[in-house]
Amino acid sequence: MAPLREKFVEADAFVIAAPNYFSGMNASTHALLERLYQFRHREADTLWGKLAVAIGVGGGDGLPVTDQIEGFMGYNFIETIAKVSGQGAACCFTCGYGETCKVGAIHMFFGPGTKITEEITPAVEKQPEVMQAAVDAGKELGRRLSEGHDRATVAARMQQQMMEKYKKST
């Protein structure tokens, strides 16, 4: 984390993306986001009030990942301004056993006997709504940054949201 530490501090915003493995983000991204804890109690001089975009892609969808990323950002009082979720190809499409495996994604999504073809292989490039959501997220992030968002206001709003969340859980 040491080489990335200053990059996190210097960044105006974050675009965090991860694959969906078993309804959660992969371990590498999870470990990276856990390391943000070192900034948590440093008041507004490091990460508080910054902006983020969360991106998740999975064999089914990326929504569980975007929700997790948003959660990590919230704990650090970083506002997630957009979440982009898409469907990518599960590893079953390339493992070599996808057409015959009875417990894999090919069998579950398309039924027994399905042949893997380019036409049925999911890819975010084939999902115009996902690609547009990514473009829109980038534009919104650029707009917010160019308008000089107030980090203190963002941090205060994020703190309030976190306090409300904890009130509901007690």
Predicted regions, residues:
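Helix-loop-strand module that forms the ligand-binding subsite of alpha/beta enzymes
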Residues: 1-88
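Glycine-rich phosphate/pyrophosphate-binding loop and the adjoining helix
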Residues: 84-170
